[in-house]
Amino acid sequence: MTRKLAAYAAGLMACSSFTAPAFAQDSEDQATPTPPRDDNVIIVTATRRAQDVQDIPIAVTAISPQALENQGVDNIQEVATLAPSFTSSQAQLASGSVVLRIRGVGTTSNNIGFESAVGIFIDGAYQSRPGVALSEFVDIERVEVLRGPQGTLFGRNTSAGALNITTKRADVNEFEGFVNASYGSFEEISVQGAVNVPIVQDTLALRVTGAWRQRDGFLDVVDRTGTVIGDTNDVDQYLVRAQLGWDTESGVRGRLIADYSKSKSSCCGAIELFQSPLVTGGAYAAVGLGLNGGNGQSVVATTPFDQTTFEEALDNRTVSANFAPVADIDNWGITGELEFPISDSADLIFIGSYRKYESFENYDSDFTDLDIFNVDALELELETWTAELRLQGEGAEGRLNYVLGGYFSDESIDQSVSFALGSEYDENVGALLFVPTGGALGPTPLELFTGIDPAGTSNTNRFQQSAQSYSVFGNVSYELVEGLELTLGARYSWEEKDGGFTQTAVNNQICPATLGALGFIPAALQPSFIGLGCFGFTAPADLPQSAVLPLVRTFQSEFSDEELIYTARIGYAFADPVNIYASFTHGYKAGGINLDTTAAVGGADPTFLSEEVDAYEIGVKSRFLDDAVTLNLAAFYEEFTNFQVLEFTGTAFQTFNVPVARSSGLEIESAIRPTDELTFNASATILDARYPEDCAGTSTAVTVLSLCGNKLTNAADVVAIFGGLWEKPLTDSVEFFLSGQIRLESDQRTSTQAIVPPGAAQIAAAGSVQAAIDAAPLIIADVQDGKEFINLRTGLRFNDGQFAIEGFVNNLTDNVVRGVTFNTTLRGSGAANSRSAFSLQPRTYGVTVRAKF
């Protein structure tokens, strides 16, 4: 499918009739009819100046509110339907496992100490984690996907790119608003609305926005017999946002925004794709855990690389667990923006924000109906302050534009996780040890050697961190000669973090007892007994034996760093509709502290290094045929050093830096409007994002060396989007419309590792680490086959869009795909590990009614 998609994408360059970024409606007033072509632009602030997206010399996908509406985009994850270089995936946690990627680059989540490589900014305020920004998309003025490192102007952690989201401003002139209501599959009900009220005409206004959405889960939860006991991956959330905006005759303008969102959605269930040979070989049955090893799914592959059955398991939409996951999230914040003119050509702008994010989650962490290992409570409190002050203006009769400023953020993290071993934990240990011992240890090996049943073992691990970031920055653009503009920018950033891991409650007798019984356990089995008797998530910390054995240790660590981030860019306007540019950017993403129980095992340093990137880009932006056709091209090469990686092995989260990773490719965005009624758009990203063969540098770590030569996760070689919009007036007051779009994705990897990293025995047998890696088997169920995703929406609009009724279907062909595939917890090892995956949403359909006033 990759070759087919590459042909599609290459055809974009040859066929201007199917090329360019979707035509934008005027973002100032989405209620008005389509304006004349000369006004058919999106004004963006990607350079911290309001400019036509076609005039700025950077790669940015600008999405209008009408485009969001036509595609039914409800949150940041669904922006991928409109931007081929952007992808999103989600793993287990509602609060912290969303991964955003731009140009194939992103930071794997599930560790609260990790920050995203894609920065998210809402109304100019930095959102410290993607999960914080997952609330409902409603009353949005525009979304900008800034591709490539953006750290010079956009604050923190934008080594891959940024999402710049702007909500609709309060209008000081008009009373207006809207109400939308939808009903769809899985009993989904959604209501959105906003009202804008001028308080002091032309000076002060209040805008209140709200949204509520509820939907049943699209995955059934079954017990070990296959009986349905519930569902998961549902939606139950609401949002309220109030905005006070002012605009005075003196030029002072600003707004104060307060928002609160609540989510009680169940997220997220994992489908077992491949069943461990320990199950099919009878080890689980031999210890009394049943022929299916506690997995009640009716479909699961039992032979490696059975792609057909992997797909059938996904299509079956069933997960096996003791109970459906529970999440309860409160998210609220305040953002203030003040623009103060200090002269006719310069403004002082302040943006400050405070946000508090609190969550409670409870889930079955072994992903089967066996009672092995649960997270009884995961409680997170995330508090963030940000402040930015900018002086920006122009000089030299408009040839000079500048931005100077300073930025500060202060973040505190407090996460407590209560883990518990279940009533069948020891039997699961018996199954894991059945093959190497020939079943000689019976069904309960831990109790056999210690006299203690591990059931009920529990503890509470607490992770805390405080982080401060400071920076000063400047960006200057100067028109050297007519049409030729040079831009130079720099930011100097300081990062400080202080955090660690402690235990606040421990009820664990099995670990000390296991260590005390090591003298009675055969030497070959001792590492397994240590790992299972002192399971990393539930083991007591700082036991005396931790000085010589790989046991959990508490830690308190500090991280500090500083970096100069800089960019140079030159752009030339051949004529009004054609602009070319070339740029170089040195970007940065701060390192930090691995907030995990195993981070300091063996005296390891729990910190990880900062990530840096050098990015080169050339591009052209053009409009022609009286602005009926738009065609943008961008070619890029990005080289990352100390690329940050987090991997879940099935028993622990490993955090490390890979010395080198690269992303290069070509991006195409295009649109054509042959008539006032028809608009076609097409875009594509042709990508090569990978760890090069020499990615390890001087590192000898197996986890690093085993990545070299493989593609990055969720980095499809080709993603192409084709769409169209037909708006046909039927009478003076009635308009028919039909909107359709298809997103094509080639094959892509869904795991961190592409092979099964060799252990000490394999390395010794092979004679070297590299020889063992070369001989290692591919990891099972890593590659997701290429797919297509088709969205359609049609309906009638009345009275110039004042009222509308619409029908929609998303994912028409019902392709259920996986974004993340991983080793199932405590269910085998190496090539004998079970493999599970988190799936994305299936086909949905429904109706929407809209009213504007």
Predicted ranges, named:
Residues M1-T81, G251, I334, F340, ...:
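N-terminal Sec signal peptide and the immediately downstream disordered periplasmic leader
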Residues S27, Y402-G405, E482-L486, T630, ...:
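Gram-negative outer-membrane beta-barrel transporters
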Residues P35-E174, I618:
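Acidic, small-polar-rich N-terminal luminal/periplasmic segments of exported/outer-membrane proteins
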Residues E115-A117, R129, V138-R147, T152-V240, ...:
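Outer-membrane beta-barrel translocator/receptor signature
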Residues N164, N173-E174, N180-S182, P198-G293, ...:
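Periplasmic-side early beta-strands and strand-to-turn transitions of outer-membrane beta-barrels
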Residues G245-D247, L391, N401, G405-S409, ...:
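Structural signature of Gram-negative outer-membrane beta-barrels, strongest in the C-terminal barrel
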Residues E337-P341, D347-Y363, A573-D596, T607-L666, ...:
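Membrane-embedded beta-barrel scaffold of Gram-negative outer-membrane proteins
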Residues D426, R743-Q762, L796-F853:
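C-terminal beta-signal and adjacent terminal beta-strands/loops
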